[in-house]
Amino acid sequence: MVDTRALAAIFAATKVLVVDDEHYMRKVVRTLLMSIGVRTIYEAANGSAGLDLIRSVAPDVVIVDWEMPGIDGAEFVRIVRSPATFPFPNVPIIMLTGHGERSRVIESVQVGVNEFLLKPVSSKALQDRMVAVLTNPRPFVRSGDYYGPAPRKMIAGVHADTDRAMANLVLVN
């Protein structure tokens, strides 16, 4: 566990990109990030602008909405998690969505999201996800078409039948 002073220093030094087509939601997330001590926050109103901002500012964390016109959150993550074509494939990504269906959570894991966060979001929930990606990052792995954070079950040494496809994971960092 990280002490309060160290956490404050980490948040103060962290650059966060918020990608959401709703201006109000970007404002809410910005306010919550500022309340936990994040000072450098970039915003993008769509997936394409978000990809451009990742390339230009190299954020430490990306918070992306699932449902957006054009490039949605899942496609956004697929593009970012393409190390052959994208310059920052290891950036931690938190999926922020109003859709908590099991299928969405599973798809988020399958495309390479680090953390999943439901709307409406609280400061505590956002802080917990930020702490997770900044102070306890999961190693990145490659398996077939998958590139992203190692599944938690793999890290814990537990493999359920549904995780057999992940058995051939290769550690990349």
For each predicted feature, which ranges?
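Alpha4 helix (beta4-alpha4-beta5 surface) of REC/receiver domains from two-component response regulators
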Residues: 30-31, 75, 89, 100-115, ...
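Short amphipathic alpha-helix used as the core "switch/output" element in two-component signaling
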Residues: 52, 74-88
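Active-site beta3 strand of CheY-like receiver
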Residues: 57-63
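Conserved acidic segment of CheY-like receiver
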Residues: 12-24, 29-33, 62
